[in-house]
Amino acid sequence: MEYKIGKEARCAVIGYGSWATAIVGLLAANEARVGWYVRNPEVLEGLLGEGRNPRYLSDVEFDRRRIAPSDDLDEVVREADIVILATPSAYLKTFLEPLTVSLQDKFVVSAIKGIVPGDYKTIVEYVHDRYDLSYKQIGIITGPSHAEEVSRGKLSYLTVVCTDPENAQMLGEKFATDYIHLSYSTDLYGIEYAAILKNIYALSVGIAVGLGYGDNFLAVLIANSAGEMRRFLEESYPAERDTLVSGYLGDLLVTCYSVYSRNRRLGLLIGHGCTVKSALNEMTMVAEGYFAADCIRHINARHKI
């Protein structure tokens, strides 16, 4: 079946966290109305009543005429041409569990930087296999960026990834604003794995900071992380790619250094002496690096890396 991705294509976002909220804000600046699947009753009530997400980025106020929050997943997906997944990777299956509407005529975009636990598949791989979609109708939107700065109109760069460059350009138009600049890539595999690996590296940086290591050591740790990322991609999926550009290295740097980095924050708590369990309980947002670490170990074994 044919999918629609051009100017007239309608967008919907699945998820209600900080990144999902920031993405809806970008889309609402360009689109007449954005579908939004919100399964949390408190968040849904806040969006419908006040145009605010009371749990994440609560200072962001939406024009309620431009958003269509709903707890009916089928309705949201049915009315959309482009479906953007913006849930934590560990909860993607449960978010999509109620779905009975076919995705065959949809263009699906992953804004998730993680691996589906237990399946040991990236989001793109999982969507491809589970919903029988071609890789041509799956895209990625990634950083380097944090939701907090995007939502406040800070100059940011996003990377749009599709196997078809024309699709990437059309998808990018949905997100472009005067403060959002876009770069494009066809490296679906490389960009997605780079976004996964950088969360693990940021966790290690947080641990190092928590243990009292300084900038000298962090420079070595992050530089070697960048090298390991490049080698992983070369071994697992050889292709011509420049891992020094923003979609790879830039995303790694912002996640390792930013005060907004939840993965760095989790590592910091562990470095300060918290148990992993207590550190996770203290986090108000999901740190993807925690789930990704074990998944990458299995993937390394699969590829014999």
Predicted feature descriptions by range:
Residues K7, K198, V205-V209, E234-I305:
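NAD(P)-dependent Rossmann-like dehydrogenase/reductase catalytic/cofactor-binding core
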Residues M1-V60, R66-D71:
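NAD(P)+-binding Rossmann beta1-loop-alpha1 motif at the extreme N-terminus of oxidoreductases
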Residues D63, S70-R78, I82-L155, L171:
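Rossmann-like NAD(P)(H) cofactor-binding subdomain of soluble oxidoreductases
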Residues Y91, S102, R130-S134, L155-D242:
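Internal alpha-helical scaffold of NAD(P)-dependent oxidoreductase catalytic cores
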Residues I14, S18, A22, E42, ...:
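Conserved active-site and cofactor/substrate-binding residues in soluble primary-metabolism enzymes
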